[in-house]
Amino acid sequence: MRPCRRLLLLLTITALVGLGASAAVAAPARSAHQHRNLPDTIQLPDGFQPEGIAITHDGTFYVGSIPTGAVFRGDVRSGRGTVAVEGRAGRAAIGLKVDAHGRLFVAGGSTGQAFVYDARSGRPLASYQLAAGTSFINDVVVTRTAAWFTDSLNPVLYRVPLGRHGGLPAQQDVTALPLSGDFQLQDGINVNGIDDALGGRVLVIVQTNTGLLFTVDPRSGVTRRIDLGGETVVNGDGILLRGRTLFVVQNLDNLVARIRLRHDLAAGRVVERISDPDFDVPTTIASFRDNLYVVNARFTTPPTPTTPYTVVRVDGR
């Protein structure tokens, strides 16, 4: 069993254990599609085994393949697309983001690496070894000054600094930021999704196994728990912050939690849990206009070369 497959199995088992803890929720679940001129579901290549998604302002979307590192690029308005980055040995694609310079940053899972591609051509631009030991590089967010990567097995974030005009750094400039403060490492899958707030001055992370949310000071690594009034987002995977509204995908729960954050990010309230009959272990989330798009990773379905995979659109208003 390959390291990446072992990690995914661990993730699935960990999430299943957490199902009971998250079954009782105060906020009601709802299901809704909108904008009938946009596809409700987008078909990905059979056998693709997707995980992460990124969408640009023009509706171009990117979805990565866990076991091969391939990236599928398409248009959310038509639902059509093609493979932009071919898979290759020694690569993986978990979370991904596109920056303002048209570059695709990809978290490399159990490879311990980060990969950067030209988003338009798919041409490799750089790769970075983030971790030397056992790790799982799970998600990424790109600010004006750095790309930040999470590690689900270690209490650390990795910083890939960007130059004044967005220039990519050398390997020796990549640093690790130890997490301190309220965050405590637990057994299983820890830090997963990440986003930034306040123009990159604060980072927000979710801890999958505990369902807790934290802010992170990117200068010091100090974490502060976001008080949800006793609620949690167990099985939290990808996250998306729009203004003061935070969306958290709860993968094996087949839910997306919508959380209204206080202006200082110290507390928030779960206002609803979005469900959809088309959800099948959704993992990550991105938006286009008022629409949310989630990737069905289907972790509970044994993957085969003919297993179908989809991206599902739901109302994000």
Regions found by a protein language model. Name each.
Residues 79-115, 124-131:
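Blade-loop segments of beta-propeller domains
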Residues 284-317:
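Blade-level signature of beta-propeller repeat domains, shared across WD40, Kelch, NHL, RCC1
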Residues 37-44, 79-87, 123-129, 175-186, ...:
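A short beta-strand motif characteristic of beta-propeller blades
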Residues 112-146, 150, 154-156, 179-180:
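Asp-box/WD-like beta-propeller blade repeats and closely related beta-sheet repeat scaffolds
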Residues 45-61, 88-104, 131-148, 181-203, ...:
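Beta-rich, blade/repeat-based domains predominating
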Residues 2-28:
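Secretory targeting and sorting signals
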Residues 75-79, 118-123, 161-166, 217-221, ...:
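Short loop/turn segments that connect beta-strands within beta-propeller blades
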Residues 61-68, 98-99, 104-111, 148-153, ...:
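Conserved beta-strand positions in repeat-built beta-propeller and related beta-rich domains
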